[in-house]
Amino acid sequence: MQPQFVLVGFLVLLGLGQNARGAEPADPVAFKHARVIDVWEAYADRLTFGQGQTLALLDDGCKLSLPEWSQSDGDLPKVRVSYDSVDDDDDPKHEGRGYHGSTIGIPSSVNYKGKRGVAFNNQVAVVRALECCHCNVSDSKTLAAGLQWVIDHHERHRITAINLAPVDDLEHAEPVATVIDAKLKRLRELGIWVSAPAGNHNFSKGISWPACQPNCFAIGAVKPGKDEVHLDRHAKLDLVVPASATSSSNAIVCGTVLLLREAIDKSGYDWKQDGPNRAAAMLTILQKTGTEVHDPTSQLTFRRLDVKAALDHVFERGRR
């Protein structure tokens, strides 16, 4: 074999090894199924994977000293800003029964010791908006305050999406009117993505609040590695995503929409053909490029997230 070919082969193998070591998916099976890993490879030279965007995590607080949040392999601190709408201060530490918010941002955002979330170069805004993610509609007041904080500060902190993480673990076939509804409506008008997990109880006649509300996208799940709908499902579901829990499926799609927004901006894609605002248009893109999955339990057909297909659609039809 000629020396130059040996050298080229060595460099290729070296590069592949570095990529493998430097990009451990936060959820390998789910990321492969949703084609997140394909996107990392295909668009490595075109996307920054979240740089310049902030994802707001509205949950039950966070232990900010955890290395996943206090350290980052990226150029910027992972946590850009924090707020507690329960106590009206900037310390979102867990109190009472809180626990969930310390991990909910991992699938979307982690960038620590080689482990990566979908949009690993993003920043997060940690908002403690209630005591525990397993909530009640009585938590709507502090949730509304957290949403209002995002409305007031989204431009300063470049917040483009919200992971509205709580679930009330009930089977709502219809919306439940509360004070969060006006905030959700305003966020939709601003084009800010807001989605929530459907719930994890195998309900088929309804889903959890606040996912059941207008202007909040409801995210369900398929089993990782298999297009089989599981956990809560209902006609209200907007999208299903590979994950073992709907909180994780919602986290994955929240990271995805940061990539999709960047792709729209860089390609010059005319999103207005898909919806009246950026958030609605992005859902349309994710739905029409997603894989059809029929659910025998509910007799409904859902669209399963295919991140690569969504980005391909945008770049192939862009004006730049």
Show the residue positions of the predicted features.
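Active-site core segment of subtilase-fold serine proteases
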Residues: 25-124, 130-138, 142-161, 249, ...
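Short acidic, glycine-rich surface-loop motifs adjacent to enzyme active sites
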Residues: 147-176, 197, 268
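Solvent-exposed loop/turn segments at secondary-structure junctions
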Residues: 60-64, 130-134, 167-172, 200-204, ...
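Bacterial N-terminal signal peptides
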Residues: 6-15
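C-terminal subdomain of the subtilisin-like protease fold in secreted/lumenal serine endopeptidases
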Residues: 35, 157-166, 262-320
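Catalytic-core regions built around general acid/base machinery
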Residues: 172-194, 209
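Extracellular S/T/G-rich loop segment that most often corresponds to the catalytic His/Ser-adjacent loop
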Residues: 59, 192, 206-267
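Boundary at the C-terminal end of the N-terminal hydrophobic targeting segment
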Residues: 17-22
